[in-house]
């Protein structure tokens, strides 16, 4: 009897009101609970067995709110009409339920997951199955709305979007890996290739192209830790005086350097640099002869070089330097900067003594340089 009453209540709304009248006359709470539980059982079976029939009955159930009396709704909460009343869940909770049920339905269509099945059963226990089917029907009918259309479109094309994202990420990762692999190949080829090939590859690679000029600059300035200075232009008289002084001694003391700089109107730094360059040139001409060189002079050999030795047109000939190298083991310099007279007999006969070697200050006239030309 109760099942027939429920079926009548599902089909016709006034018959449902008749069921409410019969239920209080029985005076049994168990029958009311059974009548309330029967729609859930019938709907679950009806939805699993005949989903089309449940969808067809949902539009019939929507006009019920217009004819449902509100007074009967407040009489008892266990009546059939109270459970089947759509106004019970319409005002505030229908929209999230609609989206939630639609999400559950889309999940079931996409994959038969146990979690989605449990969520769908919880919706059936909380709400009426007829109402749930009506909500699903409304979801299909009113899918033209912006929010619901976007949500359902996201649920239906979720797998496609994931595949697209995976493909894009895989392509991006492969591109990055290719670029990194290309950079590693360039680095390996640069490290294994000679200097000529490295120059060609550095023109195509920006970073290597920036590293290459640094290497060139460090190679050019390896002798000096600062930018190159302007080359000093020595006059003819200054060059002759410096050459004659270098013939007498290859290392200058502090006093000799100061006197020579003042006499030639040069700075001590210029005199020191010229002697350093001249010693370097002499060592190249006479390898192995610098071991017996005197070190009594104050000039060091670690200063910056700017290639001033190439300007000297009066470099001594190898025989002259050879004769002077025989007497380099005799340190004959005095603190006053004069050459000792004991060193004069050891000089060769063809080496004419000039006022420069005697420490004289009267060497400005060009007549003194005639014998040396």
UniProtKB/Swiss-Prot annotation:
<feature type="compositionally biased region" description="Low complexity">
    <location>
        <begin position="196"/>
        <end position="210"/>
    </location>
</feature>
<dbReference type="InterPro" id="IPR009057">
    <property type="entry name" value="Homeodomain-like_sf"/>
</dbReference>
<dbReference type="GO" id="GO:0000981">
    <property type="term" value="F:DNA-binding transcription factor activity, RNA polymerase II-specific"/>
</dbReference>
<dbReference type="InterPro" id="IPR001356">
    <property type="entry name" value="HD"/>
</dbReference>
<dbReference type="InterPro" id="IPR050394">
    <property type="entry name" value="Homeobox_NK-like"/>
</dbReference>
<feature type="compositionally biased region" description="Basic and acidic residues">
    <location>
        <begin position="53"/>
        <end position="63"/>
    </location>
</feature>
<keyword id="KW-0539">Nucleus</keyword>
<feature type="region of interest" description="Disordered">
    <location>
        <begin position="281"/>
        <end position="328"/>
    </location>
</feature>
<dbReference type="Pfam" id="PF00046">
    <property type="entry name" value="Homeodomain"/>
</dbReference>
<keyword id="KW-0371">Homeobox</keyword>
<dbReference type="GO" id="GO:0000978">
    <property type="term" value="F:RNA polymerase II cis-regulatory region sequence-specific DNA binding"/>
</dbReference>
<dbReference type="GO" id="GO:0006357">
    <property type="term" value="P:regulation of transcription by RNA polymerase II"/>
</dbReference>
<comment type="similarity">
    <text>Belongs to the NK-1 homeobox family.</text>
</comment>
<dbReference type="GO" id="GO:0030154">
    <property type="term" value="P:cell differentiation"/>
</dbReference>
<dbReference type="InterPro" id="IPR017970">
    <property type="entry name" value="Homeobox_CS"/>
</dbReference>
<keyword id="KW-0238">DNA-binding</keyword>
<comment type="function">
    <text>May participate in the energy homeostasis regulation.</text>
</comment>
<dbReference type="GO" id="GO:0005634">
    <property type="term" value="C:nucleus"/>
</dbReference>
<feature type="region of interest" description="Disordered">
    <location>
        <begin position="49"/>
        <end position="74"/>
    </location>
</feature>
<dbReference type="InterPro" id="IPR020479">
    <property type="entry name" value="HD_metazoa"/>
</dbReference>
<feature type="compositionally biased region" description="Polar residues">
    <location>
        <begin position="168"/>
        <end position="177"/>
    </location>
</feature>
<feature type="region of interest" description="Disordered">
    <location>
        <begin position="149"/>
        <end position="231"/>
    </location>
</feature>
<protein>
    <recommendedName>
        <fullName>NK1 transcription factor-related protein 1</fullName>
    </recommendedName>
</protein>
<feature type="compositionally biased region" description="Gly residues">
    <location>
        <begin position="296"/>
        <end position="310"/>
    </location>
</feature>
<feature type="DNA-binding region" description="Homeobox">
    <location>
        <begin position="227"/>
        <end position="286"/>
    </location>
</feature>
